A protein has these predicted regions:
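PAPS-dependent sulfotransferase catalytic core
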Residues: 1-86, 138
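PAPS-dependent sulfotransferases, especially Golgi type II membrane carbohydrate sulfotransferases
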Residues: 1-9, 160-181, 185-204, 210-284
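Conserved phosphate-donor/acceptor-positioning beta-strand/loop module used by diverse small-molecule
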Residues: 103-104, 117-137
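Hydrophobic/aromatic beta-strand patches that form the interior of the parallel beta-sheet core
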Residues: 8, 32, 121-124, 203-205
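PAPS/PAP-binding and catalytic site of the sulfotransferase fold
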Residues: 17-31, 114-117, 136-137, 204-229
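Glycine-rich phosphate-binding loop used to anchor ATP phosphates in small-molecule kinases
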Residues: 81-110
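Short His-Asn-centered micro-motif
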Residues: 11-13, 101-105, 126-127, 207-208
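Long, charge-dense
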Residues: 142-165
């Protein structure tokens, strides 16, 4: 297998800063961003890897081969290449990219396997659940509320029931916000707090910390042999291309309460159920 030594993987929940981080890194000349190869509907084979728990790929050869092609820059797909120069298929020309930045939003449960199997550094970016869920609920992508991929994995169902006393197959009576909270917990609490995935080339970083301190971004680049653009300071605060137009990041309006007390209570209940201490709970 070829060495993927020009690569970095960015994982995180949708609307948690993955696009902003990946785009900020990929602004550098000849850095190529591979955008969401795990998209279930915009790619032909993204369903092989979205919302899947894998410790390795011995029972998932199709997923392994798909990822191998992605990392080798051999998947010709407009969604994945949306941030690339696609004229004359330049995005597939070998030798041009100095770095590949691969951004995922549905592979948190297999990020460690990708790191081990392909030897690619991983940055798992997390954002507080309230802002993440509010942003997800604003864009209302149908797949965000669909927990069926998780529910079909009996080993994952058993793990969640054993560790948290919760049956993810029984969520029909849950509200949309509760389902988004369950997704956030599965994608972040399980790999970070339960499995405690870590390593010298596997980093967990908070979106809030990164946005507030440009020096943290520069340190991240140093640690992973990335080169920030010269005018980084002038673009660092810019929103990503995926920021919702009604977001206060764009409108610059004063931030208001995201949810009612009743809604906060339901989110807090799920967070408590999953024993999460990644962020403090909203006091009511």
């Amino acid at each position: 297998m070829p060495a993927f030594n020009k690569h970095i993987i960015i994982v995180g929940s949708a609307r948690s800063g993955t696009s902003w981080l990946a785009e900020t890194i990929a602004k550098q000349h000849r850095y190529r961003l591979l955008f969401e190869p795990d998209h279930e509907f915009q790619t032909k084979k993204g369903a092989l890897i979205c919302d899947k728990w894998m410790d390795d790929f011995k029972d998932a050869p199709e997923a392994f081969n798909y990822l191998k092609k992605v990392f080798a820059n051999r998947v010709d797909n407009d969604w994945i290449a949306q941030n690339s120069n696609r004229k004359w298929k330049r995005h597939l020309w070998p030798g041009i990219p100095l770095k590949f930045v691969i951004k995922f939003v549905r592979t948190n449960l297999m990020a460690s396997a990708m790191h081990k199997e392909f030897g690619i550094p991983v940055v798992h970016i997390i954002r507080n659940p309230y802002d993440t869920i509010a942003s997800q609920h604003r864009v209302k992508f149908p797949w965000l509320y669909d927990l069926s991929h998780f529910q079909k994995q009996e080993n994952l169902v058993a793990l969640i029931k054993e560790q948290f006393g919760f049956d993810i197959k029984d969520v029909s009576s849950f509200t949309e916000l509760e389902k988004l909270t369950i997704r956030w917990c599965i994608e972040n609490v399980i790999p970070i707090e339960l499995w405690k995935v870590k390593g010298s080339n596997y980093r967990v970083i908070r979106y809030e910390d990164l946005k507030a301190d440009i020096k943290l971004f520069k340190e991240l680049c140093d640690d992973f042999s990335l080169k920030p653009i010269e005018n980084l300071a002038s673009v660092y605060a810019n929103p990503s291309s995926k920021t919702h137009p009604k977001s206060n990041i764009i409108s610059q309006e004063e931030k208001t309460e995201l949810f009612s007390n009743q809604e906060y209570g339901k989110i807090n209940r799920i967070m408590t159920l999953f024993k999460s201490h990644l962020y403090p709970l909203k006091e009511l």
